[in-house]
């Protein structure tokens, strides 16, 4: 039992004695939490007046602080969260702010430019507020207990701020990738793609069907990725939805290749690209599926114009396909991120 107790104290860093001091003092002052929360917030702004700029409801307000209608509910929310997290810290073994709320706190603090020194200000304001509320109970051990509890919550928020920062870096990387798309597509590659497309586009209807049929010859399980084929007993060539879908995909791929150098980027409209990313993510498309479509595209074009086909033309079409695939993958990554965020925001049962 004693060993378990030591393990718990080591992992949480919050002792039984600290827990008792925090609980005792919170019980003595929580009935007055409305007034204390306002005092706490006013103290923050007295210690660090520029911090006012971090709150949207205070930034451009000319109303005296105590008359601002949004201050009290916000102050109450922050003060209660801080104190109740402290009270639950040892029992729960962790900061008890709900994960989705903690994530939101991290994102908000990161967005508003909160720094480590701001957490030191809230810590000072919290300790002074509690000391003034219960001077007869205040002494160094209690101060240390509340400071430790505050730091635990601050560290949890900082961890989420770092996550928000990393996600922004990732998003910027995707944007840079998208902005640089097309820059490595040479004039020679463009000429080869345009020349070959002009030679085959009048036959694009037949080629698109051939393109799609070959996908399922190489990778039969890929059929399961398409709702209109998944549960269909109709022969592939008789499926009424196959032809328009095949035409749409084949034309988009080829026309995107033709426009790639001129536009400097994949020319699928942003909304369609976003939809493509979401659909591909939802359907479970993987990197290997893009390799299949690349192989099939190259084989289809090669068979359509064998007399023009060359290694240089193969490389040009391969590069154009990869640029489109990378743009779709970037949107799939965003869709995955949005999905994870939605899952985390759902309350656990």
UniProtKB/Swiss-Prot annotation:
Q: What subcellular compartments does it reside in?
A: Cytoplasm; Nucleus
Give the Globin domain ranges.
13-162, 184-333
Q: Which UniProt keywords apply?
A: Cytoplasm, Heme, Iron, Metal-binding, Nucleus, Oxidoreductase, Oxygen transport, Transport
**Key word Transmembrane helix present in the record?**
no
Q: Where does heme b 1 bind?
A: 56, 70, 74, 104, 108-109
What the entry lists under Pfam families is as follows: Globin
Q: Which domain of life is it from?
A: Eukaryota
This protein's cofactor list reads: heme b
What GO CC terms are in its UniProt record?
cytoplasm; nucleus
Q: What is a biological process (GO) this protein takes part in?
A: response to nitric oxide
Write out the catalysed reaction: Fe(III)-heme b-[protein] + nitric oxide + H2O = Fe(II)-heme b-[protein] + nitrite + 2 H(+)
This protein's assembly is summarised as: Monomer.
Record function comment:
Phytoglobin that regulates the fine tuning of nitric oxide (NO) concentration in the cytosol in response to sudden changes in O(2) availability, and performs both symbiotic and nonsymbiotic functions. Exhibits NO dioxygenase activity in the presence of O(2) but nitrite reductase (NiR) activity in the absence of O(2) (e.g. during flooding or in waterlogged soil). May not function as an oxygen storage or transport protein.
This one is known as Anaerobic nitrite reductase Glb1-3
Lineage, opening ranks: Eukaryota, Viridiplantae, Streptophyta, Embryophyta, Tracheophyta
């Amino acid at each position: 039992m004693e060993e378990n107790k030591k393990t718990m104290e080591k992992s949480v860093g919050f002792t039984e004695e600290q827990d008792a001091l925090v609980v005792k003092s919170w019980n003595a002052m929580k009935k007055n939490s409305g007034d204390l929360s306002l005092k706490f917030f006013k103290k923050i702004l007295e210690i660090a007046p520029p911090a006012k700029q971090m709150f949207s409801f205070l930034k451009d307000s000319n109303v005296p602080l105590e008359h601002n209608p949004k201050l009290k509910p916000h102050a109450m929310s922050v003060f209660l969260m801080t104190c109740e997290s402290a009270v639950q810290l040892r029992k729960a073994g962790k900061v008890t702010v709900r994960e989705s709320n903690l994530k939101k706190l991290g994102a908000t603090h990161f967005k508003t430019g909160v720094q480590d020194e701001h957490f030191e200000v809230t810590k000072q304001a919290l300790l002074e507020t509690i000391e003034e509320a219960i001077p007869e109970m205040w002494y160094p051990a209690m101060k240390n207990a509340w400071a430790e509890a505050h730091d635990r919550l601050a560290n949890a928020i900082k961890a989420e701020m770092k996550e928000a920062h990393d996600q922004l870096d990732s998003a910027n990387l995707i944007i840079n990738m998208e902005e640089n798309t097309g820059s490595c597509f040479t004039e020679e590659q463009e000429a080869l793609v345009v020349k070959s497309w002009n030679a085959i586009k009048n036959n694009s209807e037949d080629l698109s069907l051939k393109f799609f049929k070959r996908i399922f010859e190489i990778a039969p399980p890929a059929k399961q990725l398409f709702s209109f084929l998944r549960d269909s007993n109709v022969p592939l060539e008789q499926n009424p939805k196959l032809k328009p879908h095949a035409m749409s995909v084949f034309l988009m791929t080829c026309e995107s290749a033709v426009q790639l150098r001129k536009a400097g980027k994949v020319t699928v409209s942003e909304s369609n690209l976003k939809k493509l990313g979401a659909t591909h993510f939802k359907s479970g498309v993987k990197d290997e599926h893009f390799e299949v479509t690349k192989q099939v595209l190259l084989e289809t074009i090669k068979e359509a114009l064998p007399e023009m086909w060359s290694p240089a033309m193969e490389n040009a079409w391969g590069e154009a396909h990869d640029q489109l695939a990378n743009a779709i993958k970037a949107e799939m990554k965003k869709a995955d991120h949005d999905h994870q965020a939605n899952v985390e925001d759902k309350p656990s049962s």
